[in-house]
Curated annotation (Swiss-Prot):
Heterodimer of LeuC and LeuD. It comes from Bacillus cereus (strain ATCC 14579 / DSM 31 / CCUG 7414 / JCM 2152 / NBRC 15305 / NCIMB 9373 / NCTC 2599 / NRRL B-3711). The keyword rRNA processing does not apply. One of its GO terms (molecular function) is 3-isopropylmalate dehydratase activity. This is 3-isopropylmalate dehydratase small subunit. Belongs to the LeuD family. LeuD type 1 subfamily. Catalyzes the isomerization between 2-isopropylmalate and 3-isopropylmalate, via the formation of 2-isopropylmaleate. Its EC number is 4.2.1.33. Coiled coil: none annotated.
Amino acid sequence: MMEPFRIHKGTAAVLMNDNIDTDQIIPKQYLKRIERTGFGKFLFDEWRYDNNRQENPNFPLNAQERKGASILITGDNFGCGSSREHAPWALADYGFRVIIAGGFADIFYMNCMKNGMLPIVMDKDMREQLAKTDAREQITVDLENEIMTTNTHRFHFTIEKMWKEKLLNGLDEISITMQYEQEIKEYERKVALH
């Protein structure tokens, strides 16, 4: 079972590039493990670090005031490319709980949900307003009411009911299956009789 997602408060990091693919999120050389943890240090690896593994001071996530951000505001078509689940793992391990983009690749969107992160589709004007939020300002994301607020703005977002219920209740595929444990046992009993 995942941790339920109801209300999240956090600061934002801004990376308004379009078409950020899963290889840019987490390069393929780091995908040799199947654990879900330990990938955050490789997030946006080729952008965050120089050839000597020193932080690139020009990369937005390396700005001191953006460290510890748990909300990522980004461009269109985020998470395109291959369907590796390691990309959401890296984002979550880094500390992101909410990703706000103009759109997401379908599989990436579902993988975010399956890993307890909330991907929000928001138009460019609203994302640009959010991006102007002071780096230290808390943004509140209220999933139940589908509202996001800053000190000066209030934004409405929508999410498909099925995904919303899964996140609100912390339900992953295993915990959903376990809700039908009795029915599964009954089916197995009937099949065994034939």
